[in-house]
UniProtKB/Swiss-Prot annotation:
Alphabetical UniProt keywords: Ribonucleoprotein, Ribosomal protein, RNA-binding, rRNA-binding
GO molecular function, one term: structural constituent of ribosome
Protein name per Swiss-Prot or TrEMBL: Small ribosomal subunit protein uS19
Keyword Iron: no
Signal peptide interval: none
GO cellular component, one term: cytoplasm
Listed GO biological process terms: ribosomal small subunit assembly; translation
Family matches, as PANTHER family: RIBOSOMAL PROTEIN S19P FAMILY MEMBER, SMALL RIBOSOMAL SUBUNIT PROTEIN US19M
Role this protein plays: Protein S19 forms a complex with S13 that binds strongly to the 16S ribosomal RNA.
Species assigned in the record: Xanthomonas oryzae pv. oryzae (strain KACC10331 / KXO85)
Length: 89
């Protein structure tokens, strides 16, 4: 279900402050806020998003605007389905 337009996009306050202050900085912004929406002000900034174990650097571009930060830091690793060991030559 989509968020109401009258409410506007959700961004954690601490993340919004860091984005404003790091306008021309090359250093990535560390955040645990996977639920925050990517705004046009974040384009060109590298944000290190926590995936539960470590921080994944995400370089924000125009195509990511409107999505959540957590969509770009995968939390699960797929090792592959079990199979016959003989056929894996």
């Amino acid at each position: 279900m989509a968020r109401s337009l009258k409410k506007g996009p959700f961004v954690d306050h601490h993340l919004a402050k860091k984005v404003e202050s790091a306008a021309g900085s090359k250093k990535p912004i560390k955040t645990w806020s996977r639920r925050s929406m990517i705004l046009p002000e974040m384009v060109g900034i590298t944000i290190a998003v926590h995936n539960g174990k470590n921080h994944i650097p995400v370089l924000v571009n125009e195509n990511m605007v409107g999505h959540k930060l957590g969509e770009f830091a995968v939390t699960r690793t797929f090792k592959g389905h079990g199979g016959d060991k003989k056929s894996s030559r």
